[in-house]
């Protein structure tokens, strides 16, 4: 990997280093692995990869940048000419159960509007069209931003999906429907097409979640402990989420979430003593350790989603290991009760909810 060394305004250089494994003891982890965009192989009907002038939103962003390959001028990749007619396809993969992505990628509507405005500002006599399913502009001043693109910059919005894109006589033929006009067919001859591809979880997110023992949803985005009350916390104590690793997010929401995670970490470190839930799992220790009912099968250790089950060796006075039993780490246990259900010898209980305690409560109710 590469590292940047030096000071701003002074000499700076990039130095290559080989990958290495670093082991550190930390008090908290903030997961900020971000997200990726859908592989364009998922929609061959759009012709990406087959036709050079069909690009993704990220590629268009680079074209429009002053530091990009064309110094900010919008030019076609095929011949370097300025496109006079451009089509933006929103929801390219998003909200499409057939592609396995039924969710909304959230950011596509806004950056597509921005890209269309940039095109109109740079190519004054050009025409821009946006195919969309619904305009989801849910942030502060987002709706006004989209209205400005339509009313002031003259971007043409067409409500409907694109069915097919192909090339004919040097033009890209975009075929779709306008659902606001009774699903009437629409055909546009474009010089360039930009696909607003869906946001998906990073490759390896599922493997990372399993290693860190944090939950994830069916789309491999990391799951928060509670969507309303604990949006930056995970079910594993000390591990927090920030940014688009949890779901596709824009910059303001990512910054707000990162600030919340930082506050949670600072609050954790400012405490002299860590506060934990009292209702945690405990292994039966009513008998002398040697006669513990735990048989050491460790099915509970395999089942525990928080890696809170450890192995404890019971030794005699000479240090000889007599038995290995399960032990619950109270700092990691979240009291979910999974280990209780898996324990064949019934050696684990939730503190405060043992069989004897629950039985006593039931008998007290019956007697009354």
Annotate each language-model stretch with its function.
Residues 1-9, 13:
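Single conserved hydrophobic/aromatic residue that forms the stacking wall/gate
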Residues 10-368:
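Residues forming the flavin
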């Amino acid at each position: 990997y590469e590292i940047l060394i030096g000071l701003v305004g002074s000499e700076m250089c990039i130095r290559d280093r080989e990958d290495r494994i670093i082991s550190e003891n930390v008090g908290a982890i903030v997961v900020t692995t971000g997200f990726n965009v859908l592989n364009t192989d998922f929609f061959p009907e759009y012709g990406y990869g087959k036709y050079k002038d069909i690009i993704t939103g990220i590629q268009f962003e680079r074209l429009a940048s002053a530091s990009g390959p064309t110094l900010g001028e919008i030019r076609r990749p095929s011949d370097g000419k300025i496109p006079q007619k451009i089509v933006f396809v929103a929801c390219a993969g998003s909200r499409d159960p057939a592609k396995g992505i039924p969710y909304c990628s959230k950011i596509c509507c806004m950056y597509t509007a921005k890209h269309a405005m940039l095109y109109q500002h740079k190519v004054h006599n050009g025409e821009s069209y946006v195919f969309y399913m619904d305009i989801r502009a849910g942030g502060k001043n987002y709706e006004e931003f989209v209205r400005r693109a339509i009313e002031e910059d003259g971007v043409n919005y067409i409500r409907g999906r694109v069915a097919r894109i192909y090339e004919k006589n040097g033009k890209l033929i975009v075929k779709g429907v306008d659902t606001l006009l009774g699903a009437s067919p629409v055909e546009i001859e474009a010089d360039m097409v930009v696909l607003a591809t869906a946001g998906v979880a990073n490759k390896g997110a599922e493997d990372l979640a399993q290693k860190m023992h944090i939950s994830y949803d069916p789309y491999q985005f990391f799951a928060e402990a509670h969507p309303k009350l604990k949006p930056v916390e995970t079910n594993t104590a000390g591990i927090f989420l920030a940014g688009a690793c949890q779901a596709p997010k824009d910059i303001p929401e990512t910054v707000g979430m990162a600030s919340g995670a930082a506050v949670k970490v600072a609050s954790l470190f400012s405490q002299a003593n860590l506060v934990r839930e009292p209702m945690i799992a405990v292994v039966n220790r009513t008998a002398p350790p040697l006669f513990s009912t735990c048989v050491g099968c460790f099915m509970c250790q395999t089942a525990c989603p928080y890696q809170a089950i450890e192995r404890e060796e019971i030794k005699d006075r000479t240090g000889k290991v007599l038995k290995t039993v399960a032990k619950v780490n109270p700092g990691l246990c979240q009291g979910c009760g999974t280990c209780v259900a898996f324990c064949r010898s019934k050696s684990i209980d939730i503190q405060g909810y043992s069989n004897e305690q629950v039985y006593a409560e039931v008998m007290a109710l019956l007697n009354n």
